[in-house]
């Protein structure tokens, strides 16, 4: 399972020090070093959520509480939404729908940056990672899915639907690398130290986070410092509006979302905020798997396959639950639609 954290890519790669950097090579290098076996925790989190959706669907079918159109809409939503359902379920759609972007890839970039910054700056998340095994498991699932989707965007863009936004990714990395290069020497890592109550608690937290994130304590400290500097710069840009903005709009979108998630945390439990973030990532994963082309799935299968391919196969079989529940023609209509979709060939080829 490929992994790529943009903040860690900038911090650990030394890319900011080279003028001839190639983001393709940097991403390949990083992802090879960070590739992991799909954690059991992540499998369970994802499949439990999918199972919950299917159970709800079957309950409605058995109880005949929904019309045929409503049930088909439920199935369609499972295949066509990329975060909208989660935001609607938590009454956040009006406030955060902009963060999903017009294309999946822009949504991934925004939510990935926001996730990295939020997990670095949320004191509640840090405490949860250290003291609560259940929430620590959820945090691990969030970061793993976030890094996986970012890996697909940067290294396997053919596995994602929609317009290729590679240039947006490169511009964001370039902007972030320049920012880190110019600002990392102005403030020493670990200075200030007002995030945690004491040096002993800081050491304990860093050790726990090191085990959870599988990165060095130095990387954790540097990532926290970079996230803190990005938020401060974003706030300064918004306050002064002088036109001399250091952060491009794509990076700014991620920082703005991180700020909103931190604000949401101030009036809600950490559990709820983590549920929102995880649910959005699961929706994006499911959408990416179903909307990716069959050719890309087949090509990747020859190289070992992707998690999104497993998701796609599951999505293809969701329609099997529409059997004799709402009307006599439901199953027939479903399979006729599938036949038309996969059997569109010129008449001359069928002679």
Q: How should these model regions be labeled?
A:
Residues 1-351:
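Extended, charged interaction scaffolds in large complex subunits
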């Amino acid at each position: 399972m490929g992994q790529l954290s943009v903040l860690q890519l900038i911090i650990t790669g030394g890319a900011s020090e080279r003028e001839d950097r190639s983001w393709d090579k940097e991403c390949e290098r990083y992802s090879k070093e960070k590739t992991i076996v799909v954690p059991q925790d992540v499998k369970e989190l994802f499949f439990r959520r999918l199972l919950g959706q299917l159970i709800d669907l079957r309950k409605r079918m058995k109880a005949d509480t929904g019309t045929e159109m409503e049930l088909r809409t439920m199935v369609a939503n499972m295949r066509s939404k990329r975060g909208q359902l989660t935001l609607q379920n938590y009454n956040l759609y009006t406030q955060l729908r902009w963060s999903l972007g017009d294309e999946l890839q822009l949504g991934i970039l925004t939510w990935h940056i926001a996730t990295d910054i939020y997990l670095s700056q949320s004191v509640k998340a840090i405490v949860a990672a250290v003291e609560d095994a259940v929430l620590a498991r959820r945090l691990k699932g969030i970061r793993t899915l976030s890094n996986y989707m970012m890996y697909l965007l940067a290294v396997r863009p053919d596995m994602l639907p929609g317009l290729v936004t590679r240039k947006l990714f490169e511009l964001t990395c370039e902007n972030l690398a320049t920012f880190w290069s110019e600002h990392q020497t102005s403030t020493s890592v670990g200075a200030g130290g007002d995030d945690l109550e004491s040096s002993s608690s800081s050491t304990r937290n860093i050790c726990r986070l090191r085990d959870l994130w599988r990165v060095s304590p130095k990387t954790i400290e540097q990532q926290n410092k970079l996230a803190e500097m990005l938020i401060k710069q974003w706030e300064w840009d918004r306050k002064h509006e002088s036109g001399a903005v250091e952060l491009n709009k794509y990076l700014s979108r991620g920082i703005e979302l991180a700020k909103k998630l931190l604000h949401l945390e101030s009036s809600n439990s950490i559990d709820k905020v983590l549920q929102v973030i995880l649910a959005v990532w699961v929706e994006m994963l499911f959408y990416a798997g179903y909307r990716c082309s069959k050719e890309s799935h087949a090509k990747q299968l020859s190289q070992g396959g992707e998690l999104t391919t497993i998701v796609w196969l599951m999505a293809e079989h969701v329609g099997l639950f529409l059997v004799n529940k709402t009307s006599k023609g439901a199953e027939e209509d479903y399979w006729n639609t599938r036949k038309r979709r996969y059997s569109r060939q010129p008449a001359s080829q069928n002679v």
